[in-house]
Regions:
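HIT superfamily nucleotide-processing domains
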Residues: 1-112
Length: 112
């Protein structure tokens, strides 16, 4: 369990091998982390009567990563828990800019 939980039951899924961030985690390990996280989330809903859960992984200090060992947060959520992610969402100025951004990302995706 997280020592400073957002809500009671907030759990961490931590790989045994050291990986500073998500980019160095092998795909099979990352997949297992999310499968385990989802199973824990379902258990939290059943055991502690939550309405939902978030799976959260921060990669890098600017993304909120404090402990430099990759880990996945399983945050149980209630309709009225008062917690809000601090999202700042703004649409792309144009469809062309959105498409250019998507193309640049697609060029760098490595799939084996």
């Amino acid at each position: 369990l997280d020592i400073s939980p957002i809500n009671p039951g907030h759990t961490l899924v931590i790989p045994k091998e050291h990986h500073a961030g998500s980019s160095s985690i092998p795909e099979d390990v990352a997949g297992r982390m999310f499968r385990v996280g989802s199973r824990i989330g379902v258990a939290l809903k059943r055991a502690l009567d939550y309405d939902g859960f978030n799976l959260h992984l921060a990669d890098g200090g600017c993304a909120g990563q404090v402990v430099m060992h990759a880990h996945l947060h399983v945050v149980p959520r209630g309709v009225e828990d008062g917690f809000r992610w601090n999202w700042r969402q703004e649409p792309y100025e144009t469809d062309e800019l959105r498409n250019e951004t998507a193309a640049r990302i697609a060029e760098k995706i490595k799939l084996d």
